[in-house]
């Protein structure tokens, strides 16, 4: 059996659950239970804080788990787990920031003994050790942005996605410590077990098929026969476009291909200019 640790709340919880649902791994949640069954009797789910999941996976409490890359590093377990895939969302940066009114504008302005407030003491400590700077790390459990303004810190080390919260609190970024995205991690011993490894691989393939499909679209159209080669150059597809006969018109063929979503805006007018009509663009659930 596979124990799958998932975030019980937070910014990555909902998008992760949506991906798993699209992947066909339906999770049956009863009330506020910390454990849940899935459509596969051999896969069970446990819900936990995202910051605790790296430790749970490293210790073997869970076989696999979803968490932030930054949290794996903060827990010092990056050598005790395997990174299986990057979800490509939940992007954030751990940054060093100081009040806009301060004289700190670069890391060179940080003096020995300055105080840094953070929820990420281990990552922050490693950062300053690499810089060979001796600072005092003050661990907080929230509201880090206020620390410099109430006199308990000179700087902060905090997680940000857009930088909006920092700007609203009159803080400026001095340096980036680490960037992070949502990751699927696995216990190393679990991957050594043949049965568990096979089941984990099934989960990885299912998730990858959803993540890959999210960046693609299926485009379908009817087009003149004599324009097929020109259209083929525009939409090579994953293995070339599929072309079939249109029964109602000998001069037309049906063409469909998988294309990148970000190409659609410029692609459709070009196809239309070549005589393509009845153009349909359809989302894709999964691509294997």
Swiss-Prot record:
It is an enzyme of class 2 (transferase). GO terms for molecular function: ATP binding; ATP phosphoribosyltransferase activity; magnesium ion binding. The keyword Mitochondrion does not apply. The keyword Lyase does not apply. It catalyses: 1-(5-phospho-beta-D-ribosyl)-ATP + diphosphate = 5-phospho-alpha-D-ribose 1-diphosphate + ATP. It comes from the Archaea. Feedback inhibited by histidine. GO terms for biological process: L-histidine biosynthetic process. Its cofactor is Mg(2+). Pathway: Amino-acid biosynthesis; L-histidine biosynthesis; L-histidine from 5-phospho-alpha-D-ribose 1-diphosphate: step 1/9. Its main location: cytoplasm. It is found in: Cytoplasm. One of its GO terms (cellular component) is cytoplasm. Keywords: Amino-acid biosynthesis, ATP-binding, Cytoplasm, Glycosyltransferase, Histidine biosynthesis, Magnesium, Metal-binding, Nucleotide-binding, Transferase. Pfam families: HisG (PF01634), HisG_C (PF08029). Its EC number is 2.4.2.17. CDD domains: PBP2_HisGL4 (cd13594). Belongs to the ATP phosphoribosyltransferase family. Long subfamily. PANTHER family: ATP PHOSPHORIBOSYLTRANSFERASE (PTHR21403:SF10), ATP PHOSPHORIBOSYLTRANSFERASE ATP-PRTASE (PTHR21403). Catalyzes the condensation of ATP and 5-phosphoribose 1-diphosphate to form N'-(5'-phosphoribosyl)-ATP (PR-ATP). Has a crucial role in the pathway because the rate of histidine biosynthesis seems to be controlled primarily by regulation of HisG enzymatic activity. This is ATP phosphoribosyltransferase. The lineage of its organism: Archaea, Methanobacteriati, Methanobacteriota, Methanomada group, Methanococci. The gene is hisG.
């Amino acid at each position: 059996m596979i124990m799958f640790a998932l975030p019980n709340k937070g910014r990555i919880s909902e998008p992760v659950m949506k991906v798993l649902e699209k992947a066909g791994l339906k999770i049956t949640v009863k009330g506020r239970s910390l454990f849940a069954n899935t459509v596969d009797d051999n896969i069970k789910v446990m819900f936990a804080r995202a910051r605790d999941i790296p430790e749970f996976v490293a210790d073997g409490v869970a076989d696999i788990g979803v968490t932030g890359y930054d949290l794996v590093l903060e827990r010092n377990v990056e050598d005790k787990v395997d990174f299986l895939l990057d979800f490509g969302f939940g992007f954030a940066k751990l940054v060093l920031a100081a009040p806009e009114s301060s004289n700190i504008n670069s890391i060179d302005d940080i003096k020995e003994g300055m105080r840094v407030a953070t929820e990420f003491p281990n990552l922050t400590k490693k950062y300053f050790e690499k810089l060979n700077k001796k600072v005092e790390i003050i661990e907080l459990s929230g509201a880090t942005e206020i620390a410099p303004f109430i006199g308990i810190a000179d700087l902060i080390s905090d997680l940000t996605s857009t930088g909006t919260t920092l700007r609203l609190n009159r803080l400026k970024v001095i340096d980036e410590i680490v960037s992070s995205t949502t990751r699927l991690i696995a216990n190393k011993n679990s991957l050594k077990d043949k049965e568990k490894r096979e089941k984990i691989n099934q989960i990885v393939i299912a998730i990858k098929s959803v993540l890959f499909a999210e960046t693609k679209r299926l485009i379908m159209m009817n087009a003149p026969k004599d324009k097929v080669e020109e259209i083929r150059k525009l939409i090579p597809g994953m293995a070339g476009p599929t072309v079939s006969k249109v029964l109602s018109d000998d001069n037309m063929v049906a063409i469909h291909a998988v294309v990148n979503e970000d190409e659609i805006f410029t692609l459709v007018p070009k196809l239309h200019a070549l005589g393509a009509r009845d153009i349909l663009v359809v989302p894709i659930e999964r691509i294997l």
